[in-house]
């Protein structure tokens, strides 16, 4: 691995547990919290893919809100929980092993980065709320300046770490 200089991670579902927002509300949601969380994530991914295919880009936060609205309706979650769930999504918990793995890689002088379709504000809040910001060399995002599929793919290849 001596030729490797940078390691790039996705944020949502790779470093950060997308189910953790619903899990933190499991006392209010009840036993269906995990099914609700999985449905929310599946809907979020489906909305992202469909909008990309139809060339109708929405930023990641809008997709997250839209998918939450549908998921809450389908799962019959009290609508008054919407803002709480969205606030918790902004500060998702990292998977248990993530902080230690990132620290270990950083100590080996790898440049660590996140490449995500999350907005810069979302990524910064996510990383800072979990006290991981000192571990990353760069946070990069796909959509704000490159909404079309081809453009974002070319953008990824041009990143300089």
Model-found features: residue ranges?
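Active-site neighborhood of HAD-like aspartate-dependent phosphohydrolases
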Residues: 1-45
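An amphipathic alpha-helix signature
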Residues: 22-23, 37, 41, 61-69, ...
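Short helix-capping segments at alpha-helix termini
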Residues: 29-33, 74-80, 107-108, 131-135
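Short, well-structured alpha-helical segments
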Residues: 34-41, 79-87
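A metal-dependent, Asp-based hydrolase signature
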Residues: 48-83
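Short, acidic loop-to-helix structural element flanking the phosphoryl-transfer center
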Residues: 57, 61-62, 80-114, 121-124, ...
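Substrate-recognition "cap/lid" segment bordering the active-site pocket of phosphatases
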Residues: 113-115, 119-161
């Amino acid at each position: 691995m001596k030729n490797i200089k940078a390691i790039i991670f996705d944020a949502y579902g790779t470093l950060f547990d997308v189910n953790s927002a619903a899990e933190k509300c499991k006392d209010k949601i009840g036993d269906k919290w995990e099914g609700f969380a999985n449905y929310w994530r599946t809907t979020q991914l489906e909305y992202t893919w469909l909008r990309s295919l139809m060339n109708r880009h929405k930023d990641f936060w809008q997709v997250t809100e839209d998918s939450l609205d549908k998921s809450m309706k389908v799962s019959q979650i009290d609508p008054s929980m919407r803002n709480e769930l969205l606030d918790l999504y902004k500060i998702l918990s990292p998977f248990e092993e993530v902080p230690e793995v990132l620290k270990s890689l950083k100590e080996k002088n790898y440049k660590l980065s996140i490449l995500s379709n999350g907005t810069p504000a979302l990524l910064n809040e996510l990383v800072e709320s979990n006290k991981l910001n000192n571990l990353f060399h760069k946070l990069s995002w796909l959509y704000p300046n490159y909404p079309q599929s081809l453009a974002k793919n070319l953008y990824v290849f041009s990143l300089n770490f």
